[in-house]
Structure formats: C-alpha cells, structure tokens
Amino acid sequence: MFVPFHKIKQQGFTLLEVMIAISITALIGVASTNLLSNIIETKNVTDKRSEQLVTLQRFNQFISRDVEQIINRGIRDQYGDDQAAIILDDSDYLAQWSRLGWRNSPINDDPRAEIQRVAFQIFDINDEECEAAKLRLESWGKLAPEGSCLIRFFWPMLDRASETEAKTQILLDLVEDIEIELLATTQTPVDQESKTTPERNWYTQWPNLQTGDTKEIPTAMRWRITLPEIGQVERLWLLAYDDQ
C-alpha cells in the first residue's frame, strides 16, 4: 500500500533536541573538568601540608632531644676562649649549648665524647647554606620562596681546635621568624629565709650579667617559630640544668 511522503512519521531528533543534548553534554564535561581540577588542587595542597607537618615533626624531634639533654658543660672555642654551657643570641648563632646523649657506635675504634655541642642559625633562602632547602621548595611548586632556612650545627668534639669544622643539618626549609627565650630562676642564698619566693625572668640573651649574691639558673626554654601558611608555633621545655 502506498503511503504519501507527508504522512510518514519522523523517527529522528529535531534540531532543538540535538542542541539540548549537546548543551547537557557540554555542561557535564565542564563540571567534570572543574571537579577533576579541584581534586588535583586539593591533593596538591594536602601533599604540601603533609610535607610541612613531616618537616615540623622532624624539627620537633631534633630540638626536643637537644633541649631535654642540656648539660652544664662549657667549652673552649677554636680560639681557645671559654664559652658558657648555654649561649643565646651571640654574634655567631641564635643559640648554642652542650647536650648529653651522643652515643658512640659499638664498632667505632676511635670513641668520641658523649657530650655534644650544638648550635642553630638561620640563613636567607637564597644563600648557599639553604640550597638543598630551596630545591625542595621548588619541587613543591614554590618557585620564588622568601624567608630563611634553619640550620643545626654540631661538632665532633667539645673543645675545638682551630681547624675543627661543624657538620650541618637543615631542620626547617622555610621560616619567617624565630625567637628563642630562656627562663632563669634566682637561686636564693643559703642565709636567707626559706620562705623567699625565687624570682623568674625570661631572657632573649644569655648568659645574663649577674651581680651581687643573686645567681640565676636556666629552668626552661621557649621557641616561637613563624612558618609560612601555618603561622606561629610555640614549644616550651623544662630544663634539668645542674648548676654545679
């Protein structure tokens, strides 16, 4: 039976339907791209924060071991001059002190002292001392970092010869500011009443010039560190300092 052409039912899509389908597909594509981009960005931020936390934990481990084992043992420097057991804010370092707990290797034929001298200083991130830190920061996408790196120094012997060189470790790749303070407590002379309350003072420089019968001994140390994107981190340690 012959059916006129104008009576045949159309089976395809209209132009409007095609345009709607294309628009929906495009919207889904844009949404998927944005979602993937957000996931990648979130992962990068998470990885970066994770690296920062790992670095901060490593720093905390080093500093805690160093501070908690401070000992009252002065040294002679490379010029033969006597140096105090604890020094804050001198011309060479932010801080330096003597610490116990530097164990000898059981297979070491030349045993060294088990007391170690450590020191800390910051350098501009573009200085040679911070080269490894800058490379790490660049690998994380921070191409033009501004700030300083924190370096730990330690020596193979306490009383140093003129040619003795310190070994170094980068503790923090990028810091904005570091403040180190020492809490000192007055030591009451024996002939005073036992009810006298010892006086406590915070110092950013040590040793403090002590006069008269009043003598101060270090009882605590505080570090305030300002880190980019994290802010200020504060740590406080009590010192088991034997003033004998």
Locate predicted features.
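Extracytoplasmic beta-strand-rich oligomerization domains located immediately C-terminal to a leader/signal peptide
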Residues: 37, 41-161
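N-terminal single-pass transmembrane signal-anchor helix
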Residues: 1-36
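Acidic surface patches and DE-rich sequence motifs
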Residues: 9, 77, 227
